[in-house]
UniProtKB/Swiss-Prot annotation:
SMART domains: CKS. Keywords: Cell cycle, Cell division. SUPFAM superfamilies: Cell cycle regulatory proteins (SSF55637). The lineage of its organism: Eukaryota, Metazoa, Ecdysozoa, Arthropoda, Hexapoda. This is Cyclin-dependent kinases regulatory subunit. The keyword Cell division applies.
Protein backbone atom coordinates (compact mmCIF):
# COMPACT_ATOMS: atom_id res chain seq x y z
CA UNK A 1 0.00 0.00 0.00
CA UNK A 2 2.86 2.41 0.73
CA UNK A 3 3.73 2.38 -2.98
CA UNK A 4 0.64 4.55 -3.51
CA UNK A 5 1.85 7.24 -1.10
CA UNK A 6 3.10 10.35 -2.93
CA UNK A 7 5.98 12.37 -1.47
CA UNK A 8 6.49 15.93 -2.68
CA UNK A 9 9.86 17.47 -3.32
CA UNK A 10 11.18 19.47 -0.39
CA UNK A 11 10.64 23.21 -0.30
CA UNK A 12 12.08 25.83 2.03
CA UNK A 13 11.74 29.14 3.80
CA UNK A 14 14.25 30.88 6.08
CA UNK A 15 13.60 28.53 9.03
CA UNK A 16 12.18 25.25 7.80
CA UNK A 17 12.32 22.53 5.21
CA UNK A 18 8.84 21.37 4.16
CA UNK A 19 7.22 18.55 2.27
CA UNK A 20 3.74 17.21 1.85
CA UNK A 21 2.65 13.61 1.62
CA UNK A 22 -0.49 12.54 -0.22
CA UNK A 23 -2.14 9.39 1.08
CA UNK A 24 -4.30 7.02 -0.96
CA UNK A 25 -7.98 7.07 -0.02
CA UNK A 26 -7.81 3.77 1.89
CA UNK A 27 -5.33 5.25 4.38
CA UNK A 28 -7.24 8.46 5.11
CA UNK A 29 -9.43 6.71 7.68
CA UNK A 30 -6.29 6.02 9.73
CA UNK A 31 -5.41 9.71 10.07
CA UNK A 32 -6.61 11.09 13.45
CA UNK A 33 -9.02 14.01 13.20
CA UNK A 34 -8.32 15.33 16.70
CA UNK A 35 -4.56 15.81 16.78
CA UNK A 36 -1.36 16.02 14.77
CA UNK A 37 0.36 12.68 14.38
CA UNK A 38 3.51 11.66 16.17
CA UNK A 39 6.32 10.11 14.17
CA UNK A 40 5.27 6.67 15.44
CA UNK A 41 1.71 7.27 14.21
CA UNK A 42 2.61 8.40 10.70
CA UNK A 43 5.15 5.60 10.35
CA UNK A 44 2.50 3.08 11.44
CA UNK A 45 0.29 3.99 8.46
CA UNK A 46 3.18 3.54 6.02
CA UNK A 47 4.74 7.00 5.64
CA UNK A 48 8.49 6.56 5.16
CA UNK A 49 10.88 9.48 5.46
CA UNK A 50 14.00 10.33 7.41
CA UNK A 51 13.83 11.20 11.09
CA UNK A 52 13.05 14.69 12.30
CA UNK A 53 9.96 15.47 10.22
CA UNK A 54 7.06 16.92 12.24
CA UNK A 55 3.41 16.68 11.18
CA UNK A 56 2.69 20.35 11.80
CA UNK A 57 -0.69 21.19 10.28
CA UNK A 58 -4.06 19.68 9.45
CA UNK A 59 -5.61 21.04 6.27
CA UNK A 60 -9.24 20.12 6.96
CA UNK A 61 -10.53 20.32 3.36
CA UNK A 62 -7.89 17.76 2.32
CA UNK A 63 -7.24 15.30 5.18
CA UNK A 64 -5.39 12.97 2.79
CA UNK A 65 -2.56 15.53 2.48
CA UNK A 66 -0.16 15.48 5.43
CA UNK A 67 1.97 18.59 5.92
CA UNK A 68 5.45 18.10 7.39
CA UNK A 69 8.33 20.38 8.32
CA UNK A 70 11.68 20.26 10.09
CA UNK A 71 14.25 22.90 10.98
CA UNK A 72 16.77 23.71 8.26
CA UNK A 73 20.22 22.36 9.03
CA UNK A 74 22.41 24.48 6.76
Amino acid sequence: MSKDIYYSDKYYDEQFEYRHVVLPKELVKMVPKTHLMTEAEWRSIGVQQSRGWIHYMIHKPEPHILLFRRPKTD
